[in-house]
């Protein structure tokens, strides 16, 4: 793993978010280029005895859902997301796009 990613993940978990033992940490990463950082964040959360919950969003897939989703579907998705977020103690979001 690139040492810069290790250093960034450690800083996010231990300094920025200050994850503590048994903290439930929602890690949301967007785009393929953010996977290495997400993986390292999981390791760092476990290292401080936190509990990671990882979610990946791929914008092109989301677009397909949103192009055809019903109002009811969107409301249910929002309710489910809200309930899960309410159960978390910490949130770390990572956004990235393909570098083409």
Predicted features by range, described:
Residues 1-100:
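Active-site bordering "gate/hinge" segments
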């Amino acid at each position: 793993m690139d040492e810069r990613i290790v250093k960034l993940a450690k800083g996010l978990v231990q300094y920025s978010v200050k994850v503590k033992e048994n903290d439930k940490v929602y890690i949301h990463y967007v785009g393929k280029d953010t996977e290495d950082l997400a993986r390292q964040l999981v390791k760092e959360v476990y290292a401080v005895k936190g509990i990671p919950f990882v979610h990946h969003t791929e914008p092109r897939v989301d677009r397909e859902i949103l192009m055809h989703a019903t109002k009811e579907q969107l409301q249910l998705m929002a309710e489910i997301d809200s309930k899960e977020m309410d159960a978390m103690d910490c949130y770390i979001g990572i956004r990235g796009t393909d570098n083409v």
